[in-house]
């Protein structure tokens, strides 16, 4: 989103605090701060954008929590990328299109799968430590809807935390990137010509600032906290989507919300702890209250069917009063603490030992597939 540095309506004539029209409101700002690019959000998308631009522009990253922020650090499962011997971007793309059930933009899927290996190599160069085998080669696991093992993990089930750590450290080292933590972006500011020329931000001390910039990047994550059952952290409340809508941006596919099939069914937990798909990739089975597998009757890939298929099958059973469990005793067993240390700790905190107990699971809101409509270069309608 961008328009140049022209002032918004009303800003130039203000005496004392400057009056700025943003979204559907008028704000009295205490300061005007200039940057070449403002990036709203400090998860993997926001931090990567800042690093890509930071060598050639003055970038200001704003996050309402700390660095890194959002769902990135909570992501257990890994990165799907066609880098394993015998794999290819074309095969990865075919699996992706199949899982999308006719809804994917195949041109964008092609970009995603072709650029994936290069982006992973960039993460490694920036310090991300992915799991490797005894010979030092990258270790790939298998997860749902993938025809082969192509998922990279870090520390077993702490992939997002490791990627976030590496990117945050790189951002802090970058001389032309500034970060405002614990600052809340209220609204986008539009110039008289109609484009976006910055954002109004509430700083930690409560004062308001107009971040004036010719380009604003929204990397604010999803809407998971709109749902009672979600795996998302508290800050994922759809702020970026809402401010884009107030500014008049085109939105798309808002109805597509992915529910992860296997969150820990812990009524006292908020958010619900995620039981990564990687556990099923290791061979764990979904079973009903009688200990019988049911996904083998639902889909040829059984537990590794696309997430919507698995989540729907579980939800149907829960709706009629049944319980569903993820049984990893045979597939992982005593190796659980080493293979999935984060999940093991979460389960134990709720009185479940996955080495000897089946894990009660339930679907939970996980990922917003829709959002602000953009083109192949990430440009919105504003």
Predicted regions and their residues:
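Extreme N-terminal leader/targeting segments of oxidoreductases
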Residues: 1-37, 55-56
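N-terminal Rossmann-like FAD-binding beta1-loop-alpha1 element of flavoenzymes
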Residues: 37-61
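Short beta-strand to alpha-helix junction loop
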Residues: 104-117, 151-169, 180, 230-238, ...
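An anion/pyrophosphate-binding glycine-rich loop and adjacent beta-alpha core
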Residues: 243, 249-360
């Amino acid at each position: 989103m961008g328009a140049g540095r022209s002032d918004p309506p009303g800003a130039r004539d203000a005496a004392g605090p400057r009056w700025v029209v943003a979204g559907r409101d008028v704000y009295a700002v205490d300061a005007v701060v200039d940057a070449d690019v403002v990036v709203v959000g400090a998860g993997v998308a926001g931090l990567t954008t800042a690093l890509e631009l930071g060598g050639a522009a003055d970038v200001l990253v704003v996050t309402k929590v700390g660095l890194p922020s959002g769902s990135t650090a909570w992501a257990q499962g890994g990165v799907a990328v066609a880098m394993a011997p015998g794999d290819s971007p074309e095969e990865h793309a075919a699996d992706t299109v199949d899982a999308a059930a006719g809804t994917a933009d195949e041109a964008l899927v092609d970009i995603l799968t072709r650029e994936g290996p290069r982006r992973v190599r960039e993460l490694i160069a920036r310090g991300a430590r992915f799991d490797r085998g005894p010979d030092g080669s990258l270790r790939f696991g298998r997860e749902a809807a993938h025809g082969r093992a192509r998922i990279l993990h870090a520390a077993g089930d702490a992939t997002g935390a490791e990627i976030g750590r590496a990117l945050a450290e790189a951002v802090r080292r970058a001389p032309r990137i500034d970060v405002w933590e614990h600052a809340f972006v209220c609204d986008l500011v539009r110039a008289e010509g109609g484009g976006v020329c910055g954002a109004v931000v509430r700083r930690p001390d409560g004062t308001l600032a107009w971040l004036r910039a010719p380009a604003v990047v929204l990397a604010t994550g999803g809407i998971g906290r709109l749902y009672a059952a979600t795996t998302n952290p508290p800050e994922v409340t759809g702020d970026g989507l809402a401010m884009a809508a107030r500014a008049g941006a085109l939105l798309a596919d808002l109805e597509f919300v992915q529910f992860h099939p296997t969150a820990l069914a812990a009524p006292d937990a908020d958010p619900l702890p995620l039981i990564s798909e990687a556990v099923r990739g290791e061979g764990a089975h979904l079973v009903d209250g009688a200990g019988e597998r049911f996904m083998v009757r639902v889909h040829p890939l059984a537990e590794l069917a696309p997430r919507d298929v698995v989540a729907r099958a579980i939800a149907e059973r829960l709706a009629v009063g049944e319980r569903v469990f993820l049984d990893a005793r045979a597939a992982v067993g005593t190796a659980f603490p080493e293979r999935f240390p984060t999940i093991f700790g979460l389960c134990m905190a709720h009185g479940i030992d996955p080495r000897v107990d089946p894990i009660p699971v339930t679907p939970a809101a996980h990922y917003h597939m829709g959002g602000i409509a953009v083109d192949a270069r990430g440009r919105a309608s504003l």
